[in-house]
């Protein structure tokens, strides 16, 4: 089974290609955990689809609201979201920087080939961790040892701190020299490293969700066409960016469990199960059209 599999496509933002959006721009005020972001329609539609799913899990009829605002001459649209503001700010800043470079015809890494459908590609890799602490079984009663809520909270804090310190992106794949070169994990790492990642890269942002045993990590990188080290002289060689285009506005996910973590508390060893979900998506800047669907 591939380490990255295609996710079910969930249309998030409605786009009406027949509507005229010229004139005074409508500002979208997004209240995200008490932090307010002001965005334009293009800024919002330019975000990766997987991030839009996190911001608006029930969908967003954006274009209908824009039309209503223009008809009633209201300048603002108000929306709310439950997503870490620091992660969103990092994503917005990165995309704004890439947009500015694209507008000024600045190529940060390497120019795209003629067959690429835009001026710049941005790879999003996101990891969502949820961890569970399992008390050991008492050898005398054959029943799980009881843990007080206060001790369980301290255990979760320790596990969270340990996971937060594990910043290397690919360490969780447990790749060894003995791992087969044809394994799904090594193929994934090879594809990403042929596109701009490095094997020792760290997550750019890694945070714990408040009051939850969850950790979210995000890394963005520009698609580097010159990093493709495949046999380009082979006429049948399939460039890596063609494979990544399969994830353009179609995020792919892979979920797996990791039981390699344990923690000792008051002389007792507790097993920790970690559920990881990776999301991979490609965003294309300078594309001719937005391929968004109506809810």
Curated annotation (Swiss-Prot):
Keywords: Cytoplasm, Nucleus. InterPro entries: SKP1/BTB/POZ_sf. GO terms for cellular component: catalytic step 2 spliceosome; cytosol; nucleus. It comes from the Eukaryota. It is found in: Cytoplasm; Nucleus. Its main location: cytoplasm. GO terms for molecular function: RNA binding. One of its GO terms (biological process) is mRNA cis splicing, via spliceosome. Belongs to the WHI2 family. This is WHI2-like protein P4H10.16c. It comes from Schizosaccharomyces pombe (strain 972 / ATCC 24843).
């Amino acid at each position: 089974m591939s380490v990255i599999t295609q996710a079910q496509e969930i249309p998030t933002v409605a786009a009406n290609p027949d509507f005229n959006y010229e004139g005074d721009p409508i500002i979208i005020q997004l209240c995200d955990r008490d932090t307010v972001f002001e965005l334009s329609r293009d800024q919002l539609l330019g975000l990766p689809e997987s991030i839009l799913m996190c911001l608006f899990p029930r969908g967003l009829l954006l274009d209908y609201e824009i039309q209503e605002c223009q008809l009633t001459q209201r300048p603002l649209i108000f929306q709310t979201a439950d997503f870490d503001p620091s992660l969103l700010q990092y994503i917005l800043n990165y995309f704004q920087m890439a947009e500015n470079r694209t507008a000024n015809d600045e190529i940060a890494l390497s120019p795209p080939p003629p067959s690429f459908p835009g001026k710049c590609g941005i790879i999003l890799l996101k990891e969502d961790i949820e961890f569970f602490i399992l008390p050991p079984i008492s050898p005398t009663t054959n029943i799980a040892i009881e843990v007080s809520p206060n001790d369980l909270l301290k255990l979760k804090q320790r596990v969270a701190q340990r996971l937060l310190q594990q910043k290397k992106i690919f360490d969780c794949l447990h790749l060894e020299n003995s791992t087969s070169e044809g394994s799904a994990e090594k193929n994934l790492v090879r594809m990403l490293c042929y596109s701009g990642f490095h094997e020792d890269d760290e997550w750019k942002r890694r945070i714990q969700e408040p009051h939850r045993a969850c950790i979210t990590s995000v890394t963005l990188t520009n698609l580097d066409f010159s990093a493709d080290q495949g046999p380009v002289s082979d006429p049948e060689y399939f460039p890596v960016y063609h494979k990544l285009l399969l994830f353009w506005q179609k995020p792919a996910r892979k979920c797996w469990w990791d039981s390699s973590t344990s923690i000792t508390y008051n002389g007792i060893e507790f097993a920790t199960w970690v559920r990881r979900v990776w999301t991979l998506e490609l965003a294309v800047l300078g594309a001719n059209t937005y391929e968004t669907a109506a809810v």
